[in-house]
Amino acid sequence: MNTFIIFIILIPIVGFALLAVNILLAVYKPYNEKLGAFECGLTSFNQTRLAFNAAFILVAILFLPFDLEISTLLPYVMSIYLVSNYGFTIVLLFLLILIIGFVYEINTNALKINKHNKPNTDSLIYKL
């Protein structure tokens, strides 16, 4: 039998076996400190959940393609003397697509973060 097929069959079996052992042998004793938010071992005096500006998440999501660009271009840089003009054309096309995407992000103000965006603290969640 092929080694790959053995791994495909064996890995889920081992994973489920370890999960079953954990479920059967684990001790479940919840208490307030375990169920609460971690505050460096100190009891918090107010609500720990604050509103988070979604623009920061958007910047992180938009950062991913440009971060992956570096790992995609690294093999080309290492083999620049071995690839022909065809490889160079493919890399230029790849960079052109990324540049078009970046210009689109700038034109749609996707990277603009509103400085005056404050969370609504009038909600009952934020009161003691």
Curated annotation (Swiss-Prot):
Ligase is among the record's keywords: no
Gene3D superfamilies: NADH:ubiquinone/plastoquinone oxidoreductase, chain 3
Name of the top EC class for this enzyme: translocase
Membrane-protein topology: Multi-pass membrane protein
Primary role: Core subunit of the mitochondrial membrane respiratory chain NADH dehydrogenase (Complex I) that is believed to belong to the minimal assembly required for catalysis. Complex I functions in the transfer of electrons from NADH to the respiratory chain. The immediate electron acceptor for the enzyme is believed to be ubiquinone.
Subunit structure: Complex I is composed of 37 different subunits.
Family: Belongs to the complex I subunit 3 family.
Record-given protein name: NADH-ubiquinone oxidoreductase chain 3
Source organism per UniProt: Yarrowia lipolytica (strain CLIB 122 / E 150) (Yeast)
